[in-house]
């Protein structure tokens, strides 16, 4: 309690000292109790103002009141523009320009209707299911000759594709070379078709027939596979050369393709 009383007495003494110092100034003005006290001290931009502090009047620096706008020097604004002026009314000028150029405005052209592709044209769907060494494989059929080719790019030169026989797991095999070499051209590629270079499609990256899409591990001679070959080879249209005689067939999907069997062209000793 004694400490708090001592602090109050110190503040009171300070306020009295400020009041005495301010009262002796020649510009002393009594405090009206309504002015806001300020603690700024920015030199000539401020004037002295008397305020109350702990019941005693003392002086403080406050902001100098702003000069009224009416008292500031100003340039006389003419009532009407003179004849020699370089100004213009932008709104009127833009409106007149728009009215002059409005008849020349044209609506944007209507965009062309989108061209749709048939979903079946996006896939090379001329495959045949063939049985090679006991394994069913997809082999692409050579494209039929078109009488009037349209939008056909320049095709590559025809390349002969010899058929190689599987000669694994044999000591002295004698391979039959009865199958003739056939020259085929690359398939037709237009804007709707997409070339396939994967091994699953049965063609290589050049669009030729992929004759080695089957694994060589599946060429093991089993009695069951020989019996199936004998049963399936009873069909009259199962000769090795019958595959090349079907150039006039239409394009078929793998679900509607022709099942053809290639008999083993290897002999065992």
UniProtKB/Swiss-Prot annotation:
Signal peptide: none annotated. The keyword DNA damage does not apply. Residues 215-233 have a biased composition (Acidic residues). It holds the Pfam family UPF0524. Plays a role in neuronal and neurobehavioral development. Required for normal expression of neuronal markers elavl3 and eno2 and neurobehaviors related to circadian rhythm and changes in light-dark conditions. Belongs to the UPF0524 family. This is UPF0524 protein C3orf70 homolog A. The lineage of its organism: Eukaryota, Metazoa, Chordata, Craniata, Vertebrata. The gene is c3orf70a.
